[in-house]
Swiss-Prot record:
GO terms for molecular function: molybdate ion transmembrane transporter activity. Signal peptide: none annotated. Belongs to the major facilitator superfamily. It comes from Pongo abelii. One of its GO terms (cellular component) is plasma membrane. It is a multi-pass membrane protein. This is Molybdate-anion transporter. The lineage of its organism: Eukaryota, Metazoa, Chordata, Craniata, Vertebrata. The chain crosses the membrane at residues 1-21, 43-63, 79-99, 128-148, 174-194, 195-215, 249-269, 278-298, 311-331, 344-364, 376-396, 409-429. Keywords: Cell membrane, Ion transport, Membrane, Transmembrane, Transmembrane helix, Transport. Pfam families: MFS_5.
Amino acid sequence: MLVTAYLAFVGLLASCLGLELSRCRAKPPGRACSNPSFLRSQLDFYQVYFLALAADWLQAPYLYKLYQHYYFLEGQIAILYVCGLASTVLFGLVASSLVDWLGRKNSCVLFSLTYSLCCLTKLSQDYFVLLVGRALGGLSTALLFSAFEAWYIHEHVERHDFPTEWIPATFARAAFWNHVLAVVAGVAAEAVASWIGLGPVAPFVAAIPLLALAGALALRNWGENYDRQRAFSRTCAGGLRCLLSDRRVLLLGTIQALFESVIFIFVFLWTPVLDPHGAPLGIVFSSFMAASLLGSSLYRIATSKRYHLQPMHLLSLAVLIVVFSLFMLTFSTSPGQESPVESFIAFLLIELACGLYFPSMSFLRRKVIPETEQAGVLNWFRVPLHLLACLGLLVLHDSDRKTGTRNMFSICSAVMVMALLAVVGLFTVVRHDAELRVPSPTEEPYAPEL
């Protein structure tokens, strides 16, 4: 398993580099890329945002392993994960309103403080302290995915008066480097935890200086901005009306809830499946992120002028890949007949599918959901998503260890079959909808500049 993980990592990394280099050579520079003021504003945003993302990714490979290192049972670990998910959904519902009221910069600084405290709780073996840490982690995650982007959009439009058409270029580049940071963070986590031998708590301690630096840079370089005009109840009510009045939105939300709840369960299960077979967790995690990056690169190529595939087709392909991978996992995790290499390949396919899924879903959401209702609709999407994930982990908590993992993959397979049916339903509804298609080869390319 050790050799397989390193070979997969090197192979995936080489594939990603090859695709990105060929794409960069073929793409001419855009007008936004040559604007010094725009590039400076991007740099001010990236230097804080990327530190926050790096600190977040650094903790991912060894979270389950740390709880296992503290001799907690799998059921107890499942409850810790459920606590984190419940915290994320509760704080996520009010995060946008909280950020608007508190201030975007202040919220980013609060993120660095709460996430640092979350990391410090990992030094304790007390179960209650770890539960508090998971709650802080949920708050931090909600702030990470709301405050930073809200701050940048306000600065981009209100302070610098840049064209709104340039905003996707900033976030497309951020998405690419987010994958790169995740790959590097996995290797760094493996280095401090395993190669140096500091143990599974080391990545969490190493994340604290990154969070402190992110908070300090935000305090020094960022201006504050507020938006006190949105009421939480009005936002949610508008989102619910949009969800119930448009069948496309309802089907899209169903697909997102089913697909992403399965991904949350996968995040919990990959460590106990591979760790007993000597897998280097940091390198395995980096391989996952490289596979996801490869999927994103394939998405950009597939939707380019040359191939002109539609996001709806790629969304369907992503769901099919995950269905196939989960069926693989139901066999490769059979008690007494475990095949870690097959499980690892299935996990890589799931991550590849994620690389196709997220940009496809982002494109379709942007086209289907009115901009003024997106925050409210996404709040309603998150509720079933996290509830399904929590229910899955609670079912696993009550299962026998030897058969529980296989049974959970079987349940996830059934969930993804339902997601596939929802995709077919969405296809039926939007098959003649030109709005959900990328521009034709004779028009400007859809993909934002990187």
